[in-house]
Amino acid sequence: MRGLRKRGCLFLVGGVGYSLLEIRWRRRTHWTMAAAGGLCFSLLYGLCGKMAGRSRWKKSVAGSTVITGVEFLAGCLINRRLGWGVWDYSRLPGNVMGQICLPFTFLWFLLCLPVTALCDELHRREGRCTLSQAVVR
């Protein structure tokens, strides 16, 4: 149950956090962006755990790749298959099918810099808590 609760919390933090960021940036959001944000934050948390000891910029490059991949898959489903038209990058440079583009991949990299720091801190605290719980037992 702890694993499920932790995953749910990560998903919620990512979903709410990204939705608020998008509202600030675009003045609107869509519920699917909360789902994508939750998935991305959960994946970034796992990525930071696997890349422990690596530099923040390497984690951020990997993170922006993960986010761009999620964005592409979500865009193919949400915008192209379902036709909901949540976003369209077709006028931006380096776009692929209007679903992802180079400028936003760079923005995801910049966003990943503080997010990977947060994930690293969460991992550090989780390790500290686990160790202290083990000592008490």
Give the role of each language-model region.
Residues 1-137:
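Aromatic-rich, lipid-facing transmembrane alpha helices and their immediate juxtamembrane interface loops
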